[in-house]
Amino acid sequence: MGQTVTTPLSLTLDHWKDVQCIASNQSVDVKRRRWVTFCSVEWPSFDVGWPLDGTFNLDIILQVKSKVTCPGPHGHPDQVPYIVTWEALVYHPPPWVKPFVSPKPFPLSTLPFSPPGPSAHPPSRSDLYTALIPSKPPKSRVLPPNGGPLIDLLTENLPNLPPLSKGPVKKRRPPPPRYSPPNPMESRVRGRRDPPAADSTSSQAFPLRMGGDGQLQYWPFSSSDLYNWKNNNPSFSEDPGKLTALIESVLTTHQPTWDDCQQLLGTLLTGEEKQRVLLEARKAVRGNDGRPTQLPNEVNSAFPLERPDWNYSTPEGRNHLVLYRQLLLAGLHNAGRSPTNLAKVKRITQGPNESPSAFLERLKEAYRRYTPYDPEDPGQETNVSMSFIWQSAPDIGRKLERLEDLKSKTLGDLVREAEKIFNKRETPEEREERIRRETEEKEERRRAEDEQREKERDRRRHREMSKFLATVVTGQRQDRQGGERRRPQLDEDQCAYCKEKGHWAKDCPKKPRGPRGPRPQTSLLTLGD
């Protein structure tokens, strides 16, 4: 028999075109990325039982829908199209969803008189679904001989469980189930072995549950439960928060005994991890004064390392088990905390396509894991808010820093503002268009600047040429004017010095006589000078 593990989330992603058609029929539009984010990050944080891998349980879907459509600041209107589409998948399931949707139970009164046919699929409440390729076993005769009356094992009173006062607790194996399990995960919800009553609203999926005669009956973990829990979750060292949440849900819903807790820890944790968890749990034991105690008798009484003789049939034994589970959870939380390392908290930054809510959850998880501080503590809200602003995406962080009256803003206010900024981000197509437009504008400005510089250069060259031409023309005009002013012609007996007639210049009485002074010598510059 071959099998492949799938989940409601992966199932919807494999049939994404069908999901979009269903959303279109609801007059809404859904995006694949936000579908995954809401299913695996947002809705599990509502604390209504929504698993990380999605579910087709209508009750859980309606609880998430009530949270999403809540009026006022606590609502999430951007998530309405997605939860409405989830709801439509259950109300009008396509063929690939029908095997995983809970059918309406048949009345028990009609069962004793009808021969049992092929095993019907019981309501599926598991986080994971396994698609099996069933083999066809040979049919065997299941009716009593001679047409005798059928006995409904589900309504028959179970045998009394003798009260246990001392000695080891004896585990009783369950009677043969009425339904054959459709997948290995079925035994996670043990209520499938008993069809729910019409007026029943509480789950019966407990290892310890009330039998027909008022006695508690014990149903141990199945190997398929432990196998799937171990293989579908990260190790405690890799992600202590996720594994702690799984164990917490198992302790809450299954109400395991001391032996079950040891089996659970031995399967999901390594030997070193288990010892660390047990040590932290024993440190959390409190004395009569409400303070942590180290008295061996009180520690061993509340959290024993050896198998105790607690009788789950008595109120005292059940109280011991409740306290033991609480201490075990405290040990898991304390052991999951790493040494204080604020540098690792600062490395948590918002991804390019990560929503602010998802980023805040990762940031809080880093605070829980790498610091001793509780991010939910009101006294730490300022530190978490500053980390949220500084480590957000650059465009979101810049706008958050410019908010008016930033000091009075709560962490919830900052997340809402960041969501608005995130939702108004441009799409990749818009970003490409903006970059193309900016490039064209930049190129246009560059061409205009080049043309302006060329025009300025031409004007400067024209001015220089005009000056040069003006100089040449002026020189030519002066030369022409100078050529016209020639010396006047002298007569034969006219003096060139005094311009009088009757003598020449050398005999001019008006010309000064006497020795000539030395001519001034013109100094020449040499290369040395």
UniProtKB/Swiss-Prot annotation:
PANTHER family: GAG_P30 DOMAIN-CONTAINING PROTEIN. InterPro entries: G_retro_matrix, G_retro_matrix_sf, Gag_p12, Gag_P30, Retrov_capsid_N, Retroviral_Gag-Pol_poly, Retrovr_matrix, Znf_CCHC. SMART domains: ZnF_C2HC (SM00343). Keywords: Capsid protein, Coiled coil, Host cell membrane, Host membrane, Lipoprotein, Membrane, Metal-binding, Myristate, Phosphoprotein, RNA-binding, Viral matrix protein, Viral nucleoprotein, Virion, Zinc, Zinc-finger. A zinc finger (CCHC-type) spans 493-510. Residues 429-467 form a coiled coil. The lineage of its organism: Viruses, Riboviria, Pararnavirae, Artverviricota, Revtraviricetes. The record marks Y129, T130, F206, P207, L469, A470 as: Cleavage. This is Gag polyprotein. It comes from Duplan murine leukemia virus. Residues 187-196, 425-457, 477-490, 498-510 have a biased composition (Basic and acidic residues).
